[in-house]
Amino acid sequence: MFRRVRPYSTFIDKCPPPAYDTGCTYCKVPAFPPDKRLDATTHLNGTAPSMWKHVLAFSHGVATFDTMPPKINLVPGSLASEFEVLRRKMLSPQHPVTLSNAIVSGIDGGTHQKVFIYPDCIQVEFKLANLPEFIQHYLLPVQETESVFNPFASANATPHTKVERPHLFQETPIHKDLVLICGHTQRDIRCGRIAPLLLQEFERVLAHEKLDVDVGLVSHIGGHAYAGNVIYFSKHQPPVWYGRVFPEQVQGIVRETIVEGRIIKELYRGQTM
């Protein structure tokens, strides 16, 4: 199917109804515990967290989000665990970076560490021992934003500016768009129960529409009360974040946002970058 490549300049108010039933389009969403009800009233626009870059890790060693710990840095020896140790010391506070674990069929973890970086839209493979150099090369700005003078700051603080070391990394462009659904069961049951239904529906709709788009699950990304949370990573545009997505809205997202490049207002949590 032909897809338009254009800026997200067009909005539509409502998600259109599905045109066909894949077999799971009208699947009933499982009930939630009384203390885990969905927020059906808060205006979604502006609820997406702001980030400068989003790193998706595939080399975490966890097969399903049903077994992934509630905090991804609790996986011993993982990229997330090592990243947590370094982030406060090395990252720029003016350029926030989010690291998430992702599971996508057809994308393996590689022999070392494999990550996707957005909005750069690149795949990078590297050795875990080179994580500090990875942060310096990919996750720091060329020039730091001037901050307010802090008389208590250490004179020997690590500079938060880019240092290039390309020989340590295998970098390739990302060639396919990606849809990720929050499915972090042990972090919050709401996303854990909705995600399998959304994953199945996206897979069926994308196949029906003959669209070559990857789809998978991602760890906690914020706003479980707005489940299902869906992020669409386009090769050409900033990521788009939707909330309160249910199976019957998947066809509308595919048709309006992925194919036509339009944003659906009632589901829109914001652009994350």
UniProtKB/Swiss-Prot annotation:
Listed Gene3D superfamilies: Glutaredoxin
Classification via InterPro entries: Aim32/Apd1-like (IPR009737), Thioredoxin-like_sf (IPR036249)
Family as reported in the entry's similarity comment: Belongs to the AIM32 family.
UniProt name for this protein: Altered inheritance of mitochondria protein 32
Protein's gene: AIM32
